[in-house]
């Protein structure tokens, strides 16, 4: 049995989508227990494997992260993180304030001893539909080569245990594929990656080929990773908007759109981030999953599933054995 702590109040459409996702999760997985933290006046579920705990406070999206974690001691997010810290829960999921969740992860759950800096990891879609693991996407704006090496090790374990890839290929994001390309950070990181035997390093990868499906794990610093992530999100939204405007621009195009409807739906599903769940803060002494703030019930359900798999695979202990001291 895996037990997951869930923040009922975090996210743009909480608690509605959270309750829908939790209900579906406990119905689908008979070996899953949920501890749900939030406002009891908005709780409407009844299930033997859902334990509800009332919280008097909520961390808002506009709250300053560290101050919110320190001052709102009875918030759903803080209580959720404390359940992981105490060992009562195997992991936690929230769609709330990203900075606050990262602070809760660092200051309440705590780092694995030996991990210099945790990394925020996401799984992004690829043209072949399999997706790739990408980190760091914003946990740390600055990084040393040694940090990138740890990110590679953490990402390798994540790809193996969460995504089920036996021998993941790991690449370093750079401005060229040649070993000599890049700045001092990527050059030093390349040397460290090449000497390390704990993962399958396949060299540099350029941003233009990220979504081709050629690699399983891509490593970069948090500053670069966050910009790449937001660029991909923005590009996807723009393409979708332009495609819709083109289809609706004439009767002929509307007919073509009707003919291609199923194919367009298949394409949209292949590129849907919600299929992969949320982002995970790797390197902590517990599983912390961040669902997108605008998550629907499907995306939040995927994030719960993600945390459940992490618990089943004992991913935190494996990271301790591999990267920890």
From Swiss-Prot:
Q: What is its EC number?
A: 2.3.1.274
Q: GO molecular-function annotation terms?
A: phosphate:acyl-[acyl carrier protein] acyltransferase activity
Principal place of residence: cytoplasm
Q: Name one GO cellular component term.
A: cytoplasm
- Keyword Transferase in annotation: yes
Enzymatic reactions: a fatty acyl-[ACP] + phosphate = an acyl phosphate + holo-[ACP]
Report the record's Gene Ontology biological process terms.
Answer: fatty acid biosynthetic process; phospholipid biosynthetic process
Q: Which PANTHER family match?
A: FATTY ACID/PHOSPHOLIPID SYNTHESIS PROTEIN PLSX (PTHR30100), PHOSPHATE ACYLTRANSFERASE (PTHR30100:SF1)
Protein name listed in UniProt: Phosphate acyltransferase
Provenance organism: Staphylococcus epidermidis (strain ATCC 12228 / FDA PCI 1200)
Gene that specifies this protein? plsX
């Amino acid at each position: 049995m895996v037990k997951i702590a869930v923040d009922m109040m975090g996210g743009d459409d909480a608690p509605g989508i959270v309750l829908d996702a939790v209900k579906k999760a406990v119905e689908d997985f008979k070996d899953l227990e949920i501890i749900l933290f939030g406002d009891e006046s908005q709780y409407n579920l009844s299930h033997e494997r859902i334990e509800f705990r009332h919280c008097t406070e909520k961390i808002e999206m506009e709250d300053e992260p560290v101050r919110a974690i320190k001052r709102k001691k009875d918030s759903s997010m803080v209580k959720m993180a404390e359940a992981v810290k105490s060992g009562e829960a195997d992991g936690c999921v929230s769609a709330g304030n990203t900075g606050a969740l990262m602070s809760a992860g660092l200051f309440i759950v705590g780092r694995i001893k030996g991990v210099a800096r945790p990394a925020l990891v996401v799984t992004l879609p690829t043209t072949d539909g399999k997706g790739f693991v990408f980190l760091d996407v914003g946990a740390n704006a600055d990084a040393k080569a040694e940090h990138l090496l740890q990110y590679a090790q953490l990402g390798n374990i994540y790809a193996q245990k969460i995504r089920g890839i036996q021998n993941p290929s790991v690449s370093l994001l750079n401005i060229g594929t040649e070993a000599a390309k890049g700045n001092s950070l990527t050059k030093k990181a390349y040397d460290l990656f090449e000497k390390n035997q704990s993962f399958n390093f396949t060299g540099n990868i350029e941003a233009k080929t990220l979504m081709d499906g050629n690699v399983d794990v891509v490593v970069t610093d948090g500053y670069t990773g966050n910009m790449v992530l937001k660029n991909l999100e923005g590009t996807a939204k723009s393409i979708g908007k332009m495609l819709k405007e083109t289809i609706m621009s004439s009767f002929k195009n509307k007919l073509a759109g009707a003919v291609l409807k199923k194919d367009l739906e298949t394409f949209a599903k292949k590129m849907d981030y919600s299929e992969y769940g949320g982002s995970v803060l790797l390197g902590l002494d517990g599983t912390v999953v961040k669902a997108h703030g605008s998550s629907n019930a499907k995306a939040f359900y995927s994030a719960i599933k993600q945390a459940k798999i992490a618990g089943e695979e004992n991913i935190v202990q494996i990271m301790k054995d591999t990267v920890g001291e």
